């Protein structure tokens, strides 16, 4: 699940054993009812609504006060709404792999960050304390247009920091934001132009960061342990979504959150938020508890959203869709409207196409009967609740750790679905029929999500090579390969002629076509 090289394994409590504790807490908060019990221990049709109390900001910027009448739109937005690669895979449906053009000939390295050395720090996992470097899974930088034609890159790294760079030069445009542990996964810039950044860390905290101060300033934190038990782990890997003023995010603590941000500006013109927890939903249900011997239910995928429904998957392979329309409008608990069990760990994000079909990739870790039956890449129709499976593909090649399947998020481009595998390589599948069109072998594992722009596939391998292939024909044709060093677990960001990608070798690189 996610980057095992940096995971802190925990002995997960059995949620059934925690029932007395949960019930006592719920009673104290005034939320004990049959619907809540069903949400936690049956089929999850009703979600747990958190207390309607105002969240207390953590590390708020000193000297800022809230206005008596909050602003409803930013006066000086960082970017036009939805412009740039503001979150993992570019949009709420997790379906934008990049924006061209993309180099078709061997590119040059424009810059390296840092110029020397690497982004490294020590962290502890089940094997002990050791040093980790670079950018890992999923690790896709945000690419944000700024005034006067400038671009800013924003990304987290294994030096425990979030970095903010001029995309043209690789120089820092803001001070790095230091966290308490590895800055894993991908983060999100506010899509509506507010100078806010939403970023998780392995130090148990998801942060909302103001970018209109002298240095990045944490306005609020969501702690993995706040409000209830942690089931499995306490990291934040998935990139949050901001939709209609609400933050949607899942944690490795096995809970899905909806937070109303209440964004605005104070009397000094500085951005402020007044977060209020609207819902906290368990990623498991009674059927999953009955089917699994362990309690590994963490959410490492980035929540996807389409037409009022939020979709996510967990490390037990349960894919769910929750209707949040009334949650947004009235603060009502979300209502589960879709359920499909993959049978094995599903860390890849759900991808939604323009017609509302879902594409989901999972791993082969436990080799359950269900995962053998379903396969590791599926197309689902959430409107067919009784039989949503449209087609499935087996990805049974075995790679690192004796495991198969995929950690990568699918790319759905044109009439083809592209998926990278733990065994090493990329598989192309007909989007309509599920028929395999071709397979491409690469040194594995290939955890980075495929990027396909203008008929060019860009994928990194675990020998430190970033490669490009022409995929407009019946078979992929190699265009170029450039060695960067260090396993490439992260997903490249392709934006208008440049490629930005980090490696486990310690650095982030900017590539562009040669003059």
Where on the chain are the PLM-derived regions?
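C-terminal region of N-terminal signal peptides and the immediate post-cleavage residues
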Residues: 30-54
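Intrinsically disordered, low-complexity serine/threonine-rich segments
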Residues: 5, 49, 53, 65-68
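N-terminal export and membrane-targeting signals
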Residues: 3-25
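Phosphate/oxyanion-binding loops and surfaces in catalytic or ligand/nucleic-acid-binding neighborhoods
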Residues: 43, 88-91
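Extracytoplasmic/lumenal domain signature
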Residues: 56-83, 88, 95-137, 142-237, ...
């Amino acid at each position: 699940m996610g980057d095992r090289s940096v995971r802190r394994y925990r002995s997960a409590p059995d949620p059934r054993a925690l029932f007395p504790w949960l019930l006592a807490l719920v009673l104290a908060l005034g939320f004990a009812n049959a619907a809540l019990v069903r949400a936690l221990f049956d089929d999850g049709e009703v979600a747990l609504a958190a207390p309607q109390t105002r969240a207390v900001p953590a590390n708020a910027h000193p000297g800022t006060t809230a206005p008596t009448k909050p602003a409803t739109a930013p006066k000086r937005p960082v970017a036009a709404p939805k412009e740039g690669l503001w979150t993992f895979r570019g949009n709420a449906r997790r379906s934008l792999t990049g924006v061209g053009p993309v180099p078709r000939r061997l590119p040059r390295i424009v810059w390296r960050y840092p110029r020397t050395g690497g982004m490294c720090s020590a962290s502890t996992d089940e094997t002990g304390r050791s040093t980790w470097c670079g950018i890992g899974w999923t690790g896709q930088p945000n690419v944000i247009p700024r005034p006067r034609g400038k671009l800013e890159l924003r990304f987290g790294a294994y030096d425990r920091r979030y970095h903010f760079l001029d995309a043209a030069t690789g120089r820092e445009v803001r001070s790095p934001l230091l966290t308490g542990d590895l800055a894993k996964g991908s983060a999100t810039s506010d899509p509506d132009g507010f100078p806010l950044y939403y970023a998780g860390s392995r130090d148990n905290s998801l942060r909302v960061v103001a970018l209109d101060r002298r240095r990045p300033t944490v306005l609020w934190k969501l702690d993995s342990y706040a409000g209830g038990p942690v089931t499995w782990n306490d990291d934040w890997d998935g990139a949050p979504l901001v939709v209609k003023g609400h933050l949607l995010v899942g944690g490795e603590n096995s809970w899905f959150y909806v937070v109303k941000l209440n964004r605005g500006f104070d009397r000094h013109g500085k951005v402020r938020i007044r977060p209020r927890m609207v819902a906290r939903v368990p990623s498991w249900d009674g059927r999953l508890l009955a089917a699994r011997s362990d309690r590994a239910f963490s959410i490492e995928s980035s929540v996807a959203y389409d037409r009022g429904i939020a979709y996510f998957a967990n490390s037990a392979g349960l894919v769910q869709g929750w209707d949040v329309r009334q949650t947004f409008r009235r603060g009502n608990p979300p209502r589960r409207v879709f359920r499909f069990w993959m049978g094995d760990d599903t860390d890849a994000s759900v991808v939604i196409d323009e017609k509302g079909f879902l594409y989901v990739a999972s791993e082969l870790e436990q080799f359950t009967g269900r995962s053998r039956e379903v396969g590791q890449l599926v197309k689902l129709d959430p409107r067919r609740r009784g039989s949503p499976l449209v087609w499935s593909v087996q990805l049974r090649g075995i790679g690192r750790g004796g495991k198969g399947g995929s950690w990568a998020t699918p790319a759905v481009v044109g009439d083809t679905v592209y998926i990278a595998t733990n065994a090493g390589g990329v598989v192309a599948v007909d989007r309509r029929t599920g028929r395999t069109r071709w397979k491409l072998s690469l040194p594995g594992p290939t955890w980075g999500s495929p990027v396909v722009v203008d008929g060019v596939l860009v994928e990194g391998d675990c020998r430190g090579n970033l490669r490009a292939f022409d995929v407009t024909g019946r078979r992929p044709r190699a265009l170029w390969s450039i060695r960067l060093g260090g396993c490439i677990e992260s997903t490249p960001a392709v934006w208008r002629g440049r490629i930005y990608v980090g490696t486990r070798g310690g650095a982030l690189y900017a590539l562009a076509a040669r003059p």
